[in-house]
């Protein structure tokens, strides 16, 4: 017989209780009442966070769920978060945490091997030991990034400004669709991990920031064209040194960028994406603004490739970026 919807399986109950920090005690009505939140509002927030639908009579919530709802209500009441952005904040946080959780469960599986699936007690014990360490590391890394981002924003931007001129870069793995068909799951996981690790290191070393990675593509942002050029060229150079990764095609565009909830938007982002789509393997294409900013720098060579045929940007001029010989 299958488990009731919204409840963990009996085999996973011990592990879930360990991870959640306590036993399930409440239905969703009871949680909402204890937190002083209408059930409809609580359900909207849970949906934004990507949580599975829970039946009315399912006892799956813990004391931590009550505390979390109360905290969010307090942030809105204190006008730290506008009511209309409540769900957006929850959604953005959940998307980040969901990916982190997938990676962390992968660590558990690699540590325990077959025991992960058959020895629930051991899995729960390992979780009990590892989780506090992971929590401390997450808090440390988050605070470090928060401090760096806050310092950068305070130093470089006008108060309240959401838009500024930056360089957007897209790096895309050539032939990724074919690789998905030909690679095993393990081979594909190693490829993606290697790509993300290499890209993240190169971007950070050259003062950029990885906005997001989506399978075969990494989106990064920098504050000037020279940094973006170094990232793009170094990525292709490093990729060429290894047999583990296919070549990349990269597009760079400079212009106004709107930053919201950790993501970036605007025509500059779209132009960089379009340039990437028409770039040749192991090459870098840049738009007019990036080319103008780099022109005259002895370390780079710019080759006009003329107008490109890309969706939504007719006659978009592009230049191939290379190092000077």
Regions picked out by a protein language model, each given a short descriptive name:
Residues 158-234, 238:
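Catalytic NTP-binding/metal-coordinating core of nucleotidyl cyclase/transferase enzymes
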């Amino acid at each position: 017989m299958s488990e009731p919807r919204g409840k963990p399986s009996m085999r996973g109950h011990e592990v879930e209780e360990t991870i959640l920090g306590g036993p399930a005690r409440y239905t969703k009505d009871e949680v909402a009442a204890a937190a002083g939140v209408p059930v409809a509002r609580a359900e909207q927030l849970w949906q934004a966070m990507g949580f599975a639908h829970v039946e009315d009579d399912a006892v799956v919530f813990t004391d931590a769920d009550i505390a979390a709802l109360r905290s969010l209500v307090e942030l809105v009441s204190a006008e730290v978060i506008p009511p209309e952005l409540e769900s957006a904040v929850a959604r953005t946080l959940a998307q980040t945490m969901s990916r982190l959780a997938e990676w962390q469960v992968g660590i558990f599986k690699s540590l325990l091997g077959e025991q992960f699936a058959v020895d629930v007690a051991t899995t729960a014990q390992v979780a009990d030991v590892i989780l506090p360490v992971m929590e401390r590391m997450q808090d440390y890394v988050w605070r470090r990034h928060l401090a760096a981002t806050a310092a950068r924003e305070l130093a470089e931007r006008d108060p309240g400004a959401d838009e500024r001129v930056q360089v957007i870069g897209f790096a895309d793995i050539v032939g990724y669709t074919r690789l998905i068909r030909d690679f095993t799951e393990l081979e594909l996981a190693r490829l993606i991990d290697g790509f993300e690790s290499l890209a993240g290191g190169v971007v950070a070393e050259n003062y950029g920031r990885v906005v997001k990675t989506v399978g075969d593509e990494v989106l990064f942002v920098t504050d000037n064209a020279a940094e973006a050029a170094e990232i793009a060229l170094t990525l292709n150079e490093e990729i060429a040194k290894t047999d583990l990764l296919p070549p990349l095609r990269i597009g760079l565009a400079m212009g106004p960028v709107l930053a919201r909830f950790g993501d970036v938007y605007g025509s500059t982002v779209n132009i960089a994406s379009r340039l990437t789509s028409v770039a040749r393997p192991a090459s870098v294409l840049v738009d007019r603004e990036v080319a103008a900013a780099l022109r005259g720098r002895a370390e780079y060579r710019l080759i006009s490739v003329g107008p490109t045929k890309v969706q939504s940007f007719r006659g978009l001029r592009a230049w191939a970026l290379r190092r000077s010989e």
